[in-house]
């Protein structure tokens, strides 16, 4: 029962934040009305981002964010269409109307807040360094001169580029 209540609270926050906040900030924004009129909510996501959104053994897109999106769509009375996107081009996909929403591991930044309507955060996470347990790497400074893999267009990529001296490390 607690889980159901928590999901209901998250749904209320998401629906009101994404749509009501957007309508109050951008006078005349008809996004919600357009989605309801077409009857489909096109969700842009990275389909290789477990547990938030990924493909299961039947190649169906599933995950925590997908479950939340389904409940939001049910509340709005529209069908959910999950649209895998090139994560490096996510803002362009949204700006050109290819998708209605980016929902999955999207980091809130000041720059993004200036150009799009963002909901309240529903997950609190951070950038971390993942290495073998036997590695001598313990801090970001230990990565200097090493090859660092990041997802293109991610906040992890931004973080490493914002760290002086690491531009040449990104692969």
Question: PLM ranges: what are they?
Answer:
Residues 28-31, 36-105:
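Extracytoplasmic small-molecule ligand-binding "clamshell" domains
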Residues 89-92, 106-114, 158-164:
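A ligand-binding cleft/hinge motif common to bilobed small-molecule-binding domains
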Residues 79-86, 150, 168-171:
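Short beta-strand-to-loop elements that line the ligand-binding cleft
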Residues 110-121, 125, 165-169:
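Ligand-binding "clamshell"
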Residues 1-38:
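Short, low-complexity disordered leader/linker segments with a strong preference
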């Amino acid at each position: 029962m607690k889980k159901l209540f928590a999901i209901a609270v998250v749904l209320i926050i998401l629906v009101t934040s994404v749509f009501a906040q957007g309508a109050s900030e951008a006078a005349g924004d008809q996004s919600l009305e357009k989605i309801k009129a077409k009857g489909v909510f096109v969700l842009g996501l990275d389909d290789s981002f477990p547990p938030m959104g990924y493909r299961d053994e039947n190649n169906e897109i599933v995950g925590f964010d997908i479950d939340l999106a389904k409940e939001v769509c049910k509340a709005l009375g529209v069908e959910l269409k999950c649209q895998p996107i090139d994560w490096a081009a996510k803002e362009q996909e949204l700006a050109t109307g290819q998708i209605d929403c980016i929902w999955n591991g999207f980091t809130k930044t000041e720059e993004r807040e200036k150009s799009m309507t963002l909901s309240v955060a529903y997950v609190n996470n951070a950038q971390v360094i993942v290495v073998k347990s036997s590695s001598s790497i313990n801090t970001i400074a230990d990565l200097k001169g090493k090859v660092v893999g990041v997802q293109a267009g991610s906040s992890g990529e931004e973080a490493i580029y914002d760290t002086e001296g690491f531009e040449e490390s990104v692969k």
